[in-house]
Amino acid sequence: MNQKHLLRFIKKSYRVDADRVVYDAK
């Protein structure tokens, strides 16, 4: 897995986590 792909994967998973946190906070 190259760094660019890894970075994209981290961004995607981070965004999903952030959405989940916002949803739980409501």
Swiss-Prot record:
One Gene Ontology term from the biological process aspect of the record: IMP salvage
Protein origin, superkingdom: Eukaryota
Keyword check for Hydrolase: yes
Residues spanning the membrane: none
EC number per UniProt: 3.5.4.6
One Gene Ontology MF term: AMP deaminase activity
Family assignment from sequence similarity: Belongs to the metallo-dependent hydrolases superfamily. Adenosine and AMP deaminases family.
Protein name: AMP deaminase 1
Species in which this protein is naturally found: Gallus gallus (Chicken)
